[in-house]
A protein has these predicted regions:
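Extreme N-terminal starter segment of soluble prokaryotic enzymes
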Residues: 1-4
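ATP-binding Walker
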Residues: 9-12
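ATP-dependent small-molecule kinase phosphotransfer cores
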Residues: 28-83, 88-95, 126-127, 132-135, ...
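A glycine- and Lys/Arg-enriched "phosphate-lid" helix/loop adjacent to the NTP-binding pocket
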Residues: 49-51, 96, 100-146
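Conserved beta-strand segments of alpha/beta enzyme cores
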Residues: 26-28, 104
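Walker A/P-loop
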Residues: 15
Length: 146
């Protein structure tokens, strides 16, 4: 069993890689974002970039720096299939997954303006932001030390 972790900036193409690996290579997809959205629903909060970041940080503070991806890794193990864990964000998550011995990390990036245009076109509720907010959010997310 192989676990591929995908990290990268917003709108860089992580989803495109996931789509290829699931449709063409039979990988099973696990999403940090979807895991966090479920947690937000459980506590009655709307999913947006701020609440997703907030709940992720609270889970990490209450449990461990790698809590979210550890939970997804356990689900992946149960599947017995090659898996993708998408939207890995912190060094703690990467370090924990590397310890498994069956983990490869892909990092994806693209020019900020291209990425902003991509998120604007996909029209997700969490992506309805100005370019200035997009850049500010990205700078804030890059500051995480967990």
């Amino acid at each position: 069993m192989l676990i591929i972790g995908i990290t990268g900036t917003l709108g860089a193409g992580k989803g495109t890689i996931v789509e290829f690996l699931t449709s063409q290579k039979g990988f099973v997809h696990y999403s940090v974002r979807e895991f966090l959205k479920k947690k937000l629903l459980e506590i009655g909060l709307e999913a947006n970039r701020d609440t997703l970041t907030m709940v992720a940080n609270k889970l990490r503070e209450a449990n461990s720096a790698s809590y979210v991806t550890d939970q997804l890794y356990e689900e992946a193990l149960q599947s017995g299939s090659n898996c993708i864990i998408e939207s890995i964000r912190t060094p703690g998550e990467i370090a924990s997954l590397r310890k498994t011995g069956n983990f490869v990390l892909f990092a994806v990036d693209a020019d900020p303006l291209i990425r902003y245009k991509r998120i604007y076109l996909r029209g997700s509720e969490t992506d309805k932001i100005s370019y200035e907010v997009f850049i500010a959010n990205e700078a804030r997310e890059m500051q995480s030390t967990n």
